Amino acid sequence: MAAQKTKKKYVVTLNDVSGTLDNDLFKKMASKGDITSVSVTEVVYQTITVTGTAYATIETDEKTFKMSYFNTEEYGIIHCGGGTLFDESLGDYMADGVTKFRINSVKCKLGTGYKAVPILE
């Protein structure tokens, strides 16, 4: 007799979505835990054009955490933890209408952080 699989908890709650991520397909992907994205750490020193954002709370059996998703023209969806330096810097400049950024790494007390630097055109 086969061992019975236990279902692990993975619940994604979208707190806020905008732009190209504000659609039924992305919401369905989130509800199924099926968002495939690239970590911001994998695109350091690259330029991104942000077309949509989503802020989520994710609950698992072990923990609850926040995640931020950004749809980009260049890399598709990228992600970072909610409330990080990257998340805060990108959100701050997007509030001013900026959509094009360079991702830089910066030295912090606890190691390396990532920051969204607006591209002035």
Locate the predicted segments by residue:
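Arginine residue identity/basic-tract feature
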Residues: 7-9, 100-102, 115
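GIY-YIG-like beta-to-alpha core
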Residues: 76-88
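Short, charged beta-turn/beta-strand-edge "cap" motif at the junction between a beta-strand
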Residues: 96, 104-121
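OB-fold ssDNA-binding interfaces and closely related basic DNA-contact patches used
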Residues: 1-74, 110-111, 119-121
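Short nucleic-acid-contacting surface segments enriched for D/E, G, S/T with interspersed K/R
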Residues: 38-43, 85-104
